[in-house]
UniProtKB/Swiss-Prot annotation:
Protein known as: Cytochrome b
Chief location: mitochondrion
Record keywords: Electron transport, Heme, Iron, Membrane, Metal-binding, Mitochondrion, Mitochondrion inner membrane, Respiratory chain, Transmembrane, Transmembrane helix, Transport, Ubiquinone
Species in which this protein is naturally found: Sorex shinto sadonis (Sado shrew)
Binding site for heme b b562: 83
SUPFAM superfamilies per the UniProt record, alphabetical: Transmembrane di-heme cytochromes
Subunit description: The cytochrome bc1 complex contains 11 subunits: 3 respiratory subunits (MT-CYB, CYC1 and UQCRFS1), 2 core proteins (UQCRC1 and UQCRC2) and 6 low-molecular weight proteins (UQCRH/QCR6, UQCRB/QCR7, UQCRQ/QCR8, UQCR10/QCR9, UQCR11/QCR10 and a cleavage product of UQCRFS1). This cytochrome bc1 complex then forms a dimer.
Source organism, top-level taxon: Eukaryota
Amino acid sequence: MTNLRKTHPLMKIINSSFIDLPAPSNISSWWNFGSLLGVCLIIQILTGLFLAMHYTSDTMTAFSSVTHICRDVNYGWLIRYLHANGASMFFICLFLHVGRGLYYGSYMYLETWNIGVLLLFAVMATAFMGYVLP
């Protein structure tokens, strides 16, 4: 009798994606940081959009708009703290992801490594524009 998870069309997709995943047997927790970067980036984008809905950049009203977010907006304090701590978590995951690549010798794949370096520079430039300059 054949196994249902290998014959049923829907279960076959789930089986090949989750159960019989074509991954090396020596994969470790260091390989999770790429997906954690994606989660952190999605959190940053969503919380940044919600904060931008209520923030004003005028020098006279900027502080009062931040207090408005924390006091008057439903869960505004949580959105603000998620955005602030999400940025720190993003960079921690980013540096651990790069460190894993250095440790395992991923710099030998020049095209992939150079694209990663360009993305790192773009992230650092974006962080500079959004954090240091305002």
